[in-house]
């Protein structure tokens, strides 16, 4: 496995997602004794130096999912993920909310349902993915003013959905773990 692209799913001790770690960051948690449990496959074994007394070489084996010491005090259902175009387009499966066409990320734009100039906010519930022609056609109007109904409703991703949206190279065991926690009806399961 190519260790340069492997990301380790970091969870609190009680299983709440905290983020994605590089292999090097994960090794630091292991070396500090902060990993209290692990799941998933072993993704890498790193070798260190030799013990001067025993002559044994140190090694750390890293699993794809680690629980680190500490228990999150945040209710995961209150967390609102950071809005980025990459996550927005992935949430909407690279489909325009107005015409339904599938497009590459470079051909999509963040479209504000209620335009900023008309009091709309740059929030998950007010943005959808739009192809350039639809975004230009809609312009500074509301969808009903130009007879452009939304084909799907925007939503705020859950913490578990956000973890999926944040990583393009999720290992099968990590995806299985995250998918088991997705809200019923999540678009990320289809």
Where do the protein language model's features map onto the residues?
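Residues within alpha-helical segments
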Residues: 27, 131-132
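Histidine-centered nuclease catalytic patch
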Residues: 100-129, 138-154
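A generic structural motif
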Residues: 14, 121, 134-135
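A residue-level signal for conserved active-site and pocket-lining positions in enzyme catalytic cores
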Residues: 15, 88, 146
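Short cysteine-rich loop/turn motifs with clustered Cys
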Residues: 80-108, 128-131
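Short helix-coil boundary/hinge micro-motifs
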Residues: 1-80, 85, 154-190
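Secondary-structure junction/capping motif
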Residues: 21-22, 84, 96, 115, ...
């Amino acid at each position: 496995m190519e260790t340069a692209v492997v990301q380790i799913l970091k969870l609190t001790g009680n299983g709440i997602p905290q983020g994605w770690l590089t292999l090097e960051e994960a090794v630091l948690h292991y070396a500090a004794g902060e990993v209290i449990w692990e799941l998933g496959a072993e993704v890498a074994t790193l070798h260190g130096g030799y013990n001067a007394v025993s002559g044994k070489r140190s090694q750390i084996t890293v699993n794809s999912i680690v629980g680190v010491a500490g228990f999150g005090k945040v209710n995961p259902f209150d967390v609102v993920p950071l809005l980025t175009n990459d996550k927005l387009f992935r949430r909407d499966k690279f489909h325009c909310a107005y015409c339904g066409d599938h497009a590459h990320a470079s051909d999509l734009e963040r479209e504000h349902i209620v335009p900023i100039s008309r009091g709309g906010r740059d929030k998950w519930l007010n943005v959808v993915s739009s192809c350039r022609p639809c975004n230009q056609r809609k312009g500074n109007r509301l969808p009903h003013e130009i007879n452009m109904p939304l084909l799907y409703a925007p939503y705020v991703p859950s913490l578990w959905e956000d973890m999926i949206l944040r990583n393009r190279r999720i290992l099968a065991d990590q995806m299985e773990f995250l998918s088991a926690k997705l809200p019923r009806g999540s678009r990320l399961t289809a």
